A protein has these predicted regions:
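Divalent metal-cofactor coordination and adjacent catalytic microenvironments
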Residues: 1-147
């Protein structure tokens, strides 16, 4: 069973840019605008299959010794931890000799565990995202989210 925890999707549009496009003044309800920006960002990520704003992601995968497993979010910037996950929820860092990681040319992340004695699941921590902030999101995507 695969589970991905990455928290709320950060807005992939700058609030000032959205206000200007929508012709909404500074007196408009900030909470409503923030909610709309978060919603459109999440929809854009689901539609494109791309993580727009860089963030840390924690993913749980089954142990499959010797098999490469793809991570669920892309583009992957870095894989920072591979841990064995015990039934009680505690994690233990696996020795680097017991696993391999790879980020391919398409920025898909991969993990292969050779040994995970006593663990039925893995917790992988990694960073994924196209841009550090909204200004780095490609123009075409930003335009699409505004429309």
């Amino acid at each position: 069973m695969r589970a991905i925890e990455d928290g709320p999707v950060p807005p992939a549009l700058d609030e000032a840019e959205a206000r200007a496009f929508l012709r909404v003044g500074a007196g408009a309800d900030n909470a409503v605008l923030a909610s709309l920006l978060a919603s459109v960002s999440a929809l854009a990520e689901r539609f494109t299959g791309v993580t727009l704003i860089r963030r840390t992601i924690s993913e749980t995968l089954p142990v499959a010794p010797g098999c490469w497993q793809a991570l669920g979010r892309a583009p992957v910037n870095a894989i920072s931890a591979v841990e064995g996950l015990a039934i009680d929820g505690t994690t233990t860092a696996l020795p680097i000799t017991d696993y391999a990681i790879d980020i391919d040319a398409r920025a898909d992340g991969w993990v292969r565990v050779d040994r995970a004695d006593g663990f039925g699941r893995l917790r992988i921590s990694y960073t994924a995202g196209v841009a550090v902030d909204a200004s780095g999101v490609p123009e075409g995507l930003r335009q699409g989210m505004l429309l």
